[in-house]
Every structure is written in structure tokens, then in C-alpha cells.
């Protein structure tokens, strides 16, 4: 593993240039007025004057989509809240990346594209103010059970793309209308000691079991060299997700790409669907490590989503030193939600190989929940050094012997 992954030192914001406290530039304290233009003007001013740190001081400041520029950074002071507008008109439609596709969709609350060294810091909060979006989603789903996530028209909390040397540290990232953190085509990205939360129930009175839909904690989309260390994650979907593209020709599309060299460590999970999920919108995931984490009540620790319409290859995944409680430790099923298989004669066979589980002490209701398909094969799975043969479930795992776990 590269030495870069050992660096968990926080960024000292005093080294990032002048601090621009937004209230010094006409931004008013108060949660009701949407002040997108005023806050964006502070960002633009900082960029024009050589860069610096845009500071959200104590208090609540409501805004729509903000776009950070080269040399600028965001700091949320303790007691400060950057709160998202709950009106979709405050988030412009632009060419972006969502659900494994490059397409026109709504901007996120905090956007950073093409930046080197961008930092989000502070003990304060970025609050997506998602309640109205969540309730609209579930009402729409009642009206049309086939509606997609994009049909509901919701912004993400943060979207970082085509960037490098990025650090998000210490902040509270809560109540996102859609995905909480989405990073795309970026490298050397660190999430350090972040608190990531979205409610998992009691947000929709007709059905109290409903939570914030598709509020993934961190979506890693076609990125390399990502470190997630010391974070707390409790969301109504998957926690850390490897993405990279979907569709029958996804491996031929240059807007897609692999996820490689991702380390998740020392994290704590509340309720999530999966601690580490590969897919469903993923093409190639390689050298992914989940280690030394605690899960309170996750549904699945490792979830490998296999799309029948997408050529996928998941390899060299290590899950080590996980403690706590879960329903299912390893979960592998075909994923058929909203899939569309094209007519491709040379469609590659999808594969999972070299999946290692080592020294885990998890109270699991089910250790393995594995289904197979003629669309993919599973090879070289090991548990504590012992090869696993899932022939008791199906015939798709090779190179193993049956053991009773």
C-alpha cells in the first residue's frame, strides 16, 4: 500500500490563505432567506484575489447550489450551518454525473470541479434540509412504483469531480436529499472524522418505516486513491459505495472508469444497507480494503451487486477486523432494478475474484447470502485463510472446499 494512505493528518486551514467570513461581505444571519448569490459572490471574490477559505460562522445560512473555484476552500465553524434550500429551482440543471451516467441533472449543494487541494473543514454542519424531497419521493413512488431515483428531482449534498488532493474533515454532513457525498474521476481524496447522517425511519407519516431514500454516505465513482478514516455513517442506503458506470457497453464508455486503491478504516456504522458495496453502477473495482470498523446494525457488511446488463469485475477486496452486529456478512445477488440489457454479442462474463475476509468478529444472523447466475462467476473467496466453496448455494465458486461457518 502506498505511503500516502498513512497520512491522516488534518489540513491546517491557516495555511490555505486569507479567511473570508461570509458575514463580512453582506451575507445575513438567518435560516429563512436563500442567499445563494451572496455566498457565491464571496467564493468568487476569494478566487479572484488569489484564493482562500470561505468561512461559514456560527449561525444558519440557507443557500442553493454553490460552486467552488481554484484556490478556494470551505470551512464551517462550530455552531455554523450551511443549509440547503428545499426548492429544486435553486439547483441549476447542468451536465453532471449521476447513477452511472453522464447526463444533465441538478447540481449539488456544494460543487467542486477540476480543483487541486480543495478542502472542506470545520466542526459545523452542512445540512441538506431533505425532508420535503424525501416525502415527495415516497409520494411519487406510491403514485408510480416504477419511478426512478432521478425522477424525484433531488440535489446531492456534495459533488466533487475531476479533482485531486481533496480533504473533507471533521464536518457534519446530514439530511441530504439524495446521495450525501459523490466524488467522480478524482484521485487522492480523504474523508477524515466526518459525521454522515440521514434518518432511516419516521420521515413519511403514511409509512413510518420509510427513511431518507438513496442517501448513500460516500459514493466513490471512477476514482483512485481514496482514504476514508474515522467516519461515522448512518444513512438509509449504502454507506461506502464503489461506482463507475452501468450498461451493456459500460466498459467502452470513456466517461466511466475503475475504482482502485480505496481504504476504509476505523469507521463506525449505525444503520446502513451495506458497509461496503460494490455496484450496482460499477465496471471494475480493484484493491478495495475495509478494515478495523465497528457496525452497530448494518444489513450487510460486504455487498457485491451484480448487474446482468453490465460487464463487471470486482477483484482483490479485503474485509478485515470488523466487529459488531449485522444481518448478513457477505451478500451477493443479481441486481435488476432499472436495468436494461442491450444486444451485445461479445458481452464479457462478469466476475468476482480474490475476495478475502480475515479476523472478523461480527455477530451475523447469516454469514453468507449468495445467489449466482450464468451472467457471472465467483472465484477465490477465502475466510480466515480457508478457501470457500459455495456449492451448497450454487456451482459458481471455484477453487475451494466446503466448510461449515
List the predicted regions and their residue ranges:
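Extracellular/periplasmic carbohydrate-active domains that bind, remodel
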Residues: 1-405
